[in-house]
C-alpha cells in the first residue's frame, strides 16, 4: 500500500509530459504560407502586373509572345494627393504605355505615347509631325507597302471603319489639319505603324485608363496570336509549349529591359 501511495504521489509531482502537438506544426506552416501568398498576390496586383503581347502592333519593339512585367506605380494617379508623396513621373512622349482599351476597358492594350495634352499631331505620307516638326522615328516598323490614305495621311476623311471615339476626335479636335490632344488625354500609336489599331481609329487614351509602363520582358516565346488571344490555354498550345519550350523561347529577349524614347 505504501508503495502504491508513493507511486501516486510521484505521478502527481511529476505528471507525464503531454504528447507533441503534431497538428500545430502543419497549421503554423499553412498560416505562414497563406500570409506569404497573400502578400505576393497583393504585391503583384498593386505594384506590378503581368501582360503578354498578343499582336504585332508594336513590332519590332515588342513581339508577339513577349511576356512583360508592367510597373503600375510609374505614373502619378490622376487627381490624387498621393502623387505628391511618392516619386511618380508624368506620362511622356515616347513612353510605351499599357492601358485599358477605351472602346472596351476589359481589354488591355500597349502602344507608344505620341502626344500629350496640348500637342498637335498629323501624319503626311506616314511621317509624323508633332507640333509642326517632323519626327525622326528609328523604332517605327513599316510592314506593308500598300497605301492607305487615312492611315498614312492623318487626319483625313476615313476610308475605313473607325469607332465612335475616333469620329468624335475628328469632329471636335481637328484644328488646321492637325489633331489637338485634349486635357487628361493622350495620343497613342503602335510602332508597327501600318498594322496597328490605335488612336487614329479609336481616339484618345483617357488618363484614367493608363495602367503603367513595361519594365522587363521576363519571358519571350514564339507563339501565335490565336494562342495568346485565347483566355484559356488550348491543348494544342500546351502541347506546343511542352515540345518546343527550349527551341521557341527567345532567349536573347528574355529578361530584356523595356525602354521608352525621347520624342520631341
Each model region followed by its residue ranges:
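Hydrophobic membrane-insertion alpha-helices, especially the h-region
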Residues: 32-47
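Soluble "head" domains of membrane/secretory-pathway proteins
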Residues: 1-27, 46-52, 57-264
Amino acid at each position: 500500500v505504501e508503495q502504491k501511495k508513493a507511486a501516486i504521489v510521484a505521478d502527481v509531482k511529476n505528471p507525464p509530459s503531454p504528447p507533441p502537438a503534431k497538428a500545430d506544426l502543419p497549421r503554423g506552416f499553412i498560416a505562414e504560407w497563406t500570409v506569404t501568398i497573400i502578400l505576393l498576390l497583393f504585391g503583384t496586383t498593386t505594384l506590378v502586373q503581368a501582360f503578354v503581347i498578343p499582336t504585332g502592333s508594336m513590332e519590332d519593339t515588342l513581339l508577339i509572345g513577349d511576356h512583360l512585367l508592367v510597373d503600375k506605380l510609374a505614373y502619378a494617379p490622376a487627381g490624387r494627393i498621393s502623387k505628391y508623396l511618392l516619386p511618380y513621373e508624368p506620362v511622356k512622349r515616347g513612353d510605351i504605355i499599357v492601358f485599358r482599351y477605351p472602346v472596351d476597358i476589359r481589354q488591355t492594350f500597349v502602344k507608344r505615347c505620341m502626344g500629350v495634352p496640348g500637342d498637335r499631331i498629323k501624319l503626311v505620307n506616314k511621317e509624323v509631325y508633332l507640333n509642326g516638326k517632323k519626327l525622326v522615328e528609328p523604332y517605327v516598323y513599316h510592314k506593308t507597302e500598300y497605301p492607305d490614305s487615312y492611315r498614312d495621311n492623318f487626319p483625313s476623311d476615313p476610308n475605313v471603319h473607325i469607332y465612335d471615339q475616333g469620329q468624335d476626335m475628328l469632329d471636335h479636335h481637328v484644328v488646321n489639319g492637325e489633331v489637338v490632344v485634349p486635357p487628361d488625354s493622350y495620343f497613342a500609336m503602335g510602332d508597327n505603324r501600318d498594322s496597328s489599331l490605335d488612336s487614329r481609329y479609336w481616339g484618345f487614351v483617357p488618363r484614367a485608363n493608363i495602367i503603367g509602363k513595361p519594365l522587363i520582358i521576363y519571358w519571350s516565346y514564339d507563339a501565335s496570336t490565336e494562342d495568346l488571344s485565347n483566355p484559356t490555354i488550348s491543348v494544342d498550345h500546351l502541347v506546343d509549349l511542352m515540345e518546343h519550350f527550349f527551341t521557341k523561347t527567345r532567349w536573347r529577349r528574355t529578361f530584356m529591359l523595356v525602354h521608352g524614347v525621347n520624342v520631341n
